[in-house]
């Protein structure tokens, strides 16, 4: 199974999935893309708490069935039964999507459980690219190092991040101009990797002995965008785990 973590959207994100795919051919195209891309889905059993990981194993377009891999962790499989509805969350073209499947069969193949259900009648998704913001927890120190146009280097702490940009806390004596272009020499991600790119300062203001900046990415390579997406998912997953403990 793909190791990239799946995560359900926050209520704000889920509420913004106001576009619908209802045409059968388009639904099949989306599901096939998720299956071929080995997209990891986050699954929630209706009327139950908790989220589990699964993937699409097979799409039977002729008979109109969808087959899902065994839920992980294992306690998810123990909770599922025929007649229940699985709500599934994932990404299609890097945009969040949601659909539901009624489980009509629970089977096993080579020691691994699977679930079958009819094709969903609707897929909800965000049609336009949305920059969902993930926040960096206080216990996690992710650094960002910027180089200004005059060559000065300034390092600070990453506070939030999205596919569109980031927020950071910089030293109190930092000076930034709105619309100033800076080089992001290193922006640390939760997986200990760092990306480099260019960014435009959108705003800056003093706060609690620091300077908070908001920046928009201006040049972001496809590989860096994929790394960012994975980082955002991981940060949201950590926040969900924290909320469940609280």
From Swiss-Prot:
Subcellular location: Bacterial flagellum basal body
Entry's Gene Ontology molecular function annotations: cyclic-di-GMP binding
Keyword Nucleotide-binding attributed: yes
GO cellular component: bacterial-type flagellum basal body
One Pfam family, short name: PilZN
Keywords, in A-Z order: Bacterial flagellum, c-di-GMP, Nucleotide-binding
Residue intervals of the PilZ domain: 128-232
GO BP annotation list: bacterial-type flagellum-dependent cell motility; regulation of bacterial-type flagellum-dependent cell motility by regulation of motor speed
Matching InterPro entries: PilZ_domain (IPR009875), Split_barrel_FMN-bd (IPR012349), T3SS_YcgR (IPR023787), T3SS_YcgR_PilZN (IPR009926)
HAMAP family membership: YcgR
Subunit relationships: Monomer. Interacts with the flagellar basal bodies.
Task performed by this protein: Acts as a flagellar brake, regulating swimming and swarming in a bis-(3'-5') cyclic diguanylic acid (c-di-GMP)-dependent manner. Binds 1 c-di-GMP dimer per subunit. Increasing levels of c-di-GMP lead to decreased motility.
Family of the protein in this entry: Belongs to the YcgR family.
Name listed for the protein in its UniProt record: Flagellar brake protein YcgR
Organism, scientific name: Thioalkalivibrio sulfidiphilus (strain HL-EbGR7)
Lineage per the UniProt record: Bacteria, Pseudomonadati, Pseudomonadota, Gammaproteobacteria, Chromatiales
């Amino acid at each position: 199974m793909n190791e990239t973590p799946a995560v359900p959207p926050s209520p704000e994100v889920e509420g913004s999935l106001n576009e619908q795919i209802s045409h059968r051919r388009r639904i099949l195209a989306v599901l096939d893309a998720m299956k071929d891309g080995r997209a990891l889905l986050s699954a929630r059993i209706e009327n139950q708490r908790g989220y589990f990981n699964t993937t699409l194993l097979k799409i039977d377009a002729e008979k109109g069935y969808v087959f899902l891999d065994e839920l992980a962790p294992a306690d998810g499989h123990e909770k599922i039964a025929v007649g229940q509805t699985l709500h599934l969350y994932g990404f299609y073209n890097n945009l969040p999507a949601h659909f539901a499947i009624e489980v009509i069969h629970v089977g096993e193949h080579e020691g691994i459980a699977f679930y079958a259900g009819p094709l969903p009648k609707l897929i909800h998704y965000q049609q336009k690219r949305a920059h969902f913001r993930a926040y960096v927890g206080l216990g996690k120190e992710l650094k960002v190092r910027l180089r200004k146009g005059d060559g000065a280097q300034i390092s600070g702490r990453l506070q939030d991040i999205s596919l569109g940009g980031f927020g950071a806390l910089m030293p109190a004596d930092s000076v930034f101009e709105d619309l100033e272009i800076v080089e992001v020499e290193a922006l640390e991600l939760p997986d200990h990797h760092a990306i480099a790119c260019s960014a435009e300062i959108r705003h800056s203001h003093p706060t609690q002995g620091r300077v908070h900046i908001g920046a928009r990415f201006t040049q972001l390579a496809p590989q860096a965008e994929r790394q960012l997406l994975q980082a955002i998912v991981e940060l949201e997953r950590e926040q969900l785990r924290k909320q469940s403990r609280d």
